[in-house]
């Protein structure tokens, strides 16, 4: 499956559920305690990270989406730390505060990148506290396209049926990261994302692929669900829907380092992609790629859009530079822009590459960090130049251009002008050689409307492809 990332910045997602603080104490271990046969950790590093539903929200924000967050917290230092943590990552929380219970905290003691001990500080929330959280979250449904219920069975989502019904009435898709043996509480949701262990708690032991699909279909019918994505560790993911064949997506993890928060990453990537307009198979493939990235990190972590783009480029077998397709270039260009690189673009036939071309391309490249050369296809050159042109096929022209040190990407276009492809790629600077006026350069108005610049560069006098061809013909 060819995966295309949507415009994540269009995604508006509400996250409701069990929020918690993941706290890490880390340091070296060099001796055993004289008090008991346990290692002594000399703590040198303290770190707090938002976890649970809070991690889902910041994953959405890190991808570029807009996330609102609702959860239950105590009136304590941990709640303050959690608030600071989510705000620092672009998420504004809407807490339901309870005075007699602590904010859920998971304290991990780490040494040499290994977890030695985990301490949990928590008390389950009551039905009344859960109902209050869900009720205060209803007003947010008018502002979003997707809602996520992140259930860690801590009590924030005891009975979410009325919330799901309200979301459905407003056309908001509800995605659930479920917990527990009773999936009936999620009746009417759009999608559930259980892992294999959670799935088997509900349906019993899965004996085969066919058995998995059949049991998932049974849950879809029983609880009026649209789809289910079962995450299966090293076996990847399986998407089951009511009206389509199952879709198996193989794992893309390069190395499993820590699975903490992997489920949060899956549902956050799913929600962001769906809210941004991806169809369900595409969204699942994006989530699978994101999960493969996050399990290679230590602790509760997030995935950036740039990491996704780079991972997708590798999975598509793309080197990132040279002669590329338009879609490949769109990926590469987004990486460059996220790195803060200034991208220059030019275009032409470049039929017989000569010293004038080389000098011009060197000038263009000197104006930025990366240079795109859009090249007319053979059919386009023939329409513009007439019979007998091009002398060199587009493959050969692109190969020669891509070999120049000044050129980063070469991409073909089939139209008579490059206006469409320039309008799609929108470089920071569009350059054209010759005696053009800026206002007459194809694609120039679109580049300037997007905040870019347009510049005319001079060619070396007396050097042209036409003159070279005429000289060859005269000497035959």
From Swiss-Prot:
It catalyses: D-glycero-beta-D-manno-heptose 7-phosphate + ATP = D-glycero-beta-D-manno-heptose 1,7-bisphosphate + ADP + H(+); D-glycero-beta-D-manno-heptose 1-phosphate + ATP + H(+) = ADP-D-glycero-beta-D-manno-heptose + diphosphate. The gene is hldE. GO terms for molecular function: ATP binding; heptose 7-phosphate kinase activity; heptose-1-phosphate adenylyltransferase activity; phosphotransferase activity, alcohol group as acceptor. Its EC number is 2.7.1.167, 2.7.7.70. Residues 1-319 are annotated as: Ribokinase. The keyword Nucleotidyltransferase applies. ATP binds at residues 195-198. In the N-terminal section; belongs to the carbohydrate kinase PfkB family. Pfam families: CTP_transf_like (PF01467), PfkB (PF00294). This is Bifunctional protein HldE. Residues 345-476 are annotated as: Cytidylyltransferase. HAMAP family: HldE. NCBIfam families: cyt_tran_rel, PRK11316.1, rfaE_dom_I, rfaE_dom_II. GO terms for cellular component: cytosol. Pathway: Nucleotide-sugar biosynthesis; ADP-L-glycero-beta-D-manno-heptose biosynthesis; ADP-L-glycero-beta-D-manno-heptose from D-glycero-beta-D-manno-heptose 7-phosphate: step 1/4; Nucleotide-sugar biosynthesis; ADP-L-glycero-beta-D-manno-heptose biosynthesis; ADP-L-glycero-beta-D-manno-heptose from D-glycero-beta-D-manno-heptose 7-phosphate: step 3/4. SUPFAM superfamilies: Nucleotidylyl transferase (SSF52374), Ribokinase-like (SSF53613). Disulfide bonds: none annotated. One of its GO terms (biological process) is ADP-L-glycero-beta-D-manno-heptose biosynthetic process. Homodimer. The active site is at 264. InterPro entries: Bifunc_HldE (IPR023030), Carboh/pur_kinase_PfkB_CS (IPR002173), Cyt_trans-like (IPR004821), PfkB_dom (IPR011611), RfaE_dom_I (IPR011913), RfaE_dom_II (IPR011914), Ribokinase-like (IPR029056), Rossmann-like_a/b/a_fold (IPR014729). Keywords: ATP-binding, Carbohydrate metabolism, Kinase, Multifunctional enzyme, Nucleotide-binding, Nucleotidyltransferase, Transferase. Catalyzes the ADP transfer from ATP to D-glycero-beta-D-manno-heptose 1-phosphate, yielding ADP-D-glycero-beta-D-manno-heptose.
